[in-house]
């Protein structure tokens, strides 16, 4: 029964990550799986589940704080292109995304559709 709860938790983490950030579901899933695995191992070894939960919550707060401190605003077209290129693994896609964002502005919407036509 615990494995099913863990699987549901991991699934929910991936969904929430996708809803909030639109990216990072693989990282979130790997972290959630590790937390569930190690959490179950610690509880089986006699750890107090509530203490474990509080420890995880404190760790999440600290990690969030650290990430927010190191976060950088992405403002220029060049920064957008560089960030998008890293995410896509392709500089030309990064440039294309930066160009699209430059045209629609910060509040604009960009829709990406899959095409069956190669090269278009």
From Swiss-Prot:
A Gene Ontology biological process term: protein refolding
EC number annotated for this UniProt entry: 5.6.1.7
One GO molecular-function annotation for this sequence? Answer: ATP binding
Lineage: superkingdom: Bacteria
InterPro entries of this UniProt entry?
Cpn60/GroEL, Cpn60/GroEL/TCP-1, GROEL-like_equatorial_sf, TCP-1-like_intermed_sf
SUPFAM superfamilies on file: GroEL equatorial domain-like (SSF48592)
* GO CC, any one term: cytoplasm
**Record keywords:** ATP-binding, Chaperone, Cytoplasm, Isomerase, Nucleotide-binding, Stress response
Q: Could you say which residues bind ATP here?
A: 23-27
Q: Does the keyword Endoplasmic reticulum apply?
A: no
Which reaction(s) are listed as its catalytic activity?
Answer: ATP + H2O + a folded polypeptide = ADP + phosphate + an unfolded polypeptide
What compartments host this protein? Cytoplasm
Which residue positions does the secretion signal occupy? none
Summarize the subunit comment.
Forms a cylinder of 14 subunits composed of two heptameric rings stacked back-to-back. Interacts with the co-chaperonin GroES.
Q: Which family does it belong to?
A: Belongs to the chaperonin (HSP60) family.
What is the protein's known function? Answer: Together with its co-chaperonin GroES, plays an essential role in assisting protein folding. The GroEL-GroES system forms a nano-cage that allows encapsulation of the non-native substrate proteins and provides a physical environment optimized to promote and accelerate protein folding.
- PANTHER family reported for this sequence: 60 KDA HEAT SHOCK PROTEIN, MITOCHONDRIAL
State what protein this is by name: Chaperonin GroEL
Say which species the protein is native to: Mycobacterium malmoense
Name the gene behind this protein: groEL
